[in-house]
């Protein structure tokens, strides 16, 4: 079929398998260009490995460190009538390129919150790798089905205490609007912590540890975002922030546990990037369009891949073997360049000046839209979008 982008709200409902493959190819090339990562882990599990930072982690481990990788994700395969999800095609492409280089790559597709996912992963590790040296936890799901009760809990992207009103961009109409978001109820806050907090990360590490599949010195990392006062009301000071604080709580408990065998657990605070998740958060697209332009001008812009490469090579697995620098909460900070005072001051000054008319001149909004479409495999250089493509792509993946 010939596949064109179709946008509905924050989601592109179509995906392009060849475009997704080309994206992955580019990320691999970027990783290889940096040269091998010294002291890199050789057996890596990535929970949430099909897009964004999770995919970048798997690519970095495999193509930067030569690691055997297991990826866990929840994606849909394509059929002859309908394309699959971008994450399916990303994972298929990763698997193809890893195997071409003789790297071990296996994937599990299903609900990572489930007990079955953890058990199947443990069985696979025991069977193929024995133990693992690193666990990356990169789940970004709006819902969690509780494994014991089957109850489905939903998270909320809402402020706490009062209605939040701010200048935002309507990405469908390319227009500056005033967006208002009602505050979360106590139950919504609690539910957001249940879905997006640190409990499932703990369940994963505890299950892997009890099964004896974590090697001595195993490191685990989970991803977070703090941002700045421009986004705090909806993010860090909102329901989502409460969940991210719970991630810090979990990191402390897990670090204590893993330290007995020479391991570590850290939250890595990353920079804002264009992802399906961030596009759904009011004000984030406008903020990202502003901050990207300034960071590009300053020569410090990074995408997902550059961020994770820096985390591996300059934080967790440094060439001299020294311990990673952390903040007062034991977090790895990769948002340091974004939070530079000159960059943030630029955004603060610019925010009130942006209108629908000057949006494309004052910010990198055009690039934001291009990057958003690229998430789904569209607008990628070197891809013929008028060509007939097969949406059915198979690879080495087992259902959970």
Swiss-Prot record:
The gene is fabV. This is Enoyl-[acyl-carrier-protein] reductase [NADH]. It comes from the Bacteria. NCBIfam families: EnoyACPredFabV, PRK13656.1. The record marks 75 as: Plays an important role in discriminating NADH against NADPH. It holds the Pfam family Eno-Rase_FAD_bd. PANTHER family: ENOYL-[ACYL-CARRIER-PROTEIN] REDUCTASE [NADH]. Substrate binds at residue 225.
